[in-house]
């Protein structure tokens, strides 16, 4: 999977370090940030993996406003979820798509979305792109409790 060239992300060290989570770095729009946070929380509750059907059901729930933020229904278009949130997370390597997993219940292989947890050192590199990448990956890892 590749990342489209028209994707705009502010990768300044100041923005990355001052952001509260990885979604503030990846997405400019507040509504998109909220949708991605909800998705990450939902995915974490499922052990970091979900089938295409489960992700589709989650996208439907976003569209119909069944998911709440602070007791208020949150609506986000299914199309925007797939095109903006899911595509960027897969394209940047935060999620893997079509990962084969053996399903003990049905006794067959199923293909799922799987969150990546990055193996990063305890200390960040000193300068440059790798330093910024380190902090982005650390923020992503902190999103998932497993």
Language-model features and meaning:
Residues 4-12, 28, 34, 131-146:
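Exposed, interaction-prone assembly regions rather than primary DNA-binding/catalytic cores
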Residues 72-92, 97:
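Short amphipathic alpha-helical interaction segments
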Residues 48-73:
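Short acidic, hydrophobic short linear motifs in intrinsically disordered regions
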Residues 99-109:
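Short, Lys/Arg-rich nucleic-acid/phosphate-binding segment
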Residues 94-96, 102, 120:
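Charged, amphipathic alpha-helical coiled-coil/dimerization segments
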Residues 110-146:
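Short, amphipathic alpha-helical interaction segments positioned at domain boundaries
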Residues 6-52:
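Short alpha-helical segments that sit at the start of domains
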């Amino acid at each position: 999977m590749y990342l489209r060239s028209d994707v705009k992300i502010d990768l300044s060290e100041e923005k990355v370090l001052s952001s509260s989570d990885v979604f503030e770095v990846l997405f400019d729009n507040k509504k998109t940030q909220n949708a991605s946070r909800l998705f990450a929380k939902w995915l974490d509750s499922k052990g970091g993996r979900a089938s295409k059907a489960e992700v589709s059901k989650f996208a439907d729930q976003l569209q119909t406003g069944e998911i709440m933020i602070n007791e208020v229904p949150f609506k986000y278009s299914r199309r925007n979820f797939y095109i903006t949130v899911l595509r960027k997370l897969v394209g940047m390597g935060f999620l893997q798509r079509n990962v084969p997993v053996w399903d003990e219940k049905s006794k067959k292989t199923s293909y799922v979305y799987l969150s990546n947890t990055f193996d990063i050192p305890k200390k960040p590199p000193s300068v440059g792109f790798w330093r910024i990448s380190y902090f982005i990956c650390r923020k992503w890892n902190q999103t998932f409790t497993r």
